[in-house]
Design a protein with these regions (language model features):
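Short linear motifs at protein or domain termini
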Residues: 1-45, 53, 174, 180
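Short beta-strand-centered segments that line the small-molecule binding cleft or hinge
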Residues: 126
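Short, charged, intrinsically disordered terminal tails
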Residues: 168-176
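Conserved amphipathic alpha-helical segments that form helical-bundle/coiled-coil interaction surfaces
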Residues: 40-120, 129-138, 148-162
Length: 180
């Protein structure tokens, strides 16, 4: 059942067993977490702007009010230096729900679960950007402005990508220096 791991020159070990619902993409075992973070943010950049666009087309007035509440909660927690990561994930997951695409809802929950693995890489760096872009995303969805929603989500994920890219590049420079 793939529970043993043989390490050359070291022996055989029982693998770290994590329920698949906590790691549905089985990414916990990927050793290069920084590259994994880049891969995940690139996937988000491909998917989430289109999801926000669908949400702008399909969100009901009631859903828009709830989305505004989620946006306000994230903003409040950021401004009061409270843990907001789960609320941020709830915000993105709810946008997927507003898209009215059942496949998107499932995919985004899997991606957001994976994002939890590396969220500490960026969340302290992007507090103000998160507030500004979440507001823009919410406003565009509330106004049923699909182009605005797509653009705002692209900006939001791009900020995340830039922060992760800085870490990725710094790590690669460090590895190059170690090889010399």
């Amino acid at each position: 059942r793939n529970v043993l791991e043989t390490r050359r020159g070291s022996g055989t070990y029982v693998k770290d067993l994590v329920p698949t619902d906590l790691d549905p993409l089985n990414l916990r075992n990927v050793e290069d977490k920084v590259t994994l973070a880049m891969n995940l943010v690139d996937l988000r950049l491909i998917l989430e702007p289109g999801i926000a666009e669908l949400a702008a087309y399909n969100a009901t007035d009631e859903e828009i009010e709830h989305l505004k509440d989620l946006c306000d909660t994230v903003e409040y927690k950021i401004e009061h230096d409270l843990y907001y990561i789960q609320d941020d994930i709830d915000f993105h997951t709810y946008i997927a729900r507003c898209s009215k695409n059942k496949v998107v809802e499932q995919i985004i929950s899997i991606i957001e679960t994976a994002v939890l693995m590396f969220v500490n890489l960026t969340h302290r760096r992007l507090r103000q950007e998160t507030i500004i872009t979440h507001r823009a995303i919410t406003k565009s969805i509330a106004e049923h402005d699909p182009v605005g929603a797509r653009s705002a989500m692209t900006m939001h994920i791009s900020y995340n990508r830039a922060a992760i890219k800085e870490i990725y590049d710094a790590r690669n420079r460090e590895l190059e220096n170690q090889e010399q």
